[in-house]
Amino acid sequence: GITGLLFLGVYLRFGFTLATPIYMLLVAGLVVVTFVDLVDWTIPNEITYPGIPLGIVCAGLATIYPASNLQLQSIVSSVAGAAMGYLLLKGLDMFSLIAFKKHGMGMGDWKLMAMLGAFFGFANTILIIALSSFVGIALASPMIYQKYFGGDEDENPMYLPFGPSIAIAGIIAMFCGPQLIQGYLEFVGAVPQG
């Protein structure tokens, strides 16, 4: 159901171009990641390990074939996005380990962010990290409400896997990342409104 609707959305957004089957494959992987992480608290390496080089290859294809409709058309930005996504989430996890004596996220999250960085590049990696934080807050809000206002007296800490938030943010960036970045830059006055 969900995957079929997302496939339809990809086709409607990208049309009959090279981007459509590539983004359908990416979406299918992100749906799998979401449900596996929700159930098992793991993100399959079988998706992230091949996904990182595939994203870089797609950036190269888009450089050669601009009509592909792929968003990213720079191998340098693809590699930079993968590196930044991985290192930033790893850094946040290390900070959490030092400050709170526990991991803030797992290695699967780092690799998933690297994969999305490879597909969408440096600027969209920043967007995906920001969006995933907002998505995580939205997903956690019912749990937080129940714990503090719903009479749940359980003293155990609440945990929610971060992979689904990253996956949802990646899908948002795929559909409208460039428009969101452009809108933000216009809002802060970094570029003239067009």
Predicted regions and their residues:
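Juxtamembrane loop-transmembrane helix junctions in multi-pass integral membrane proteins
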Residues: 6, 10, 14-17, 39, ...
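Interfacial loop-to-transmembrane junctions
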Residues: 106-108, 145-172
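Conserved post-catalytic alpha-helical subdomain immediately downstream of the catalytic base
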Residues: 123-158
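Membrane-embedded alpha-helical segments of multi-pass transporters/permeases
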Residues: 8, 12, 60, 141-145
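C-terminal structured domain segments across diverse proteins
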Residues: 141-145, 158-160, 183-191
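Hydrophobic residues within the alpha-helical transmembrane core of Major Facilitator Superfamily
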Residues: 5, 31, 56, 92, ...
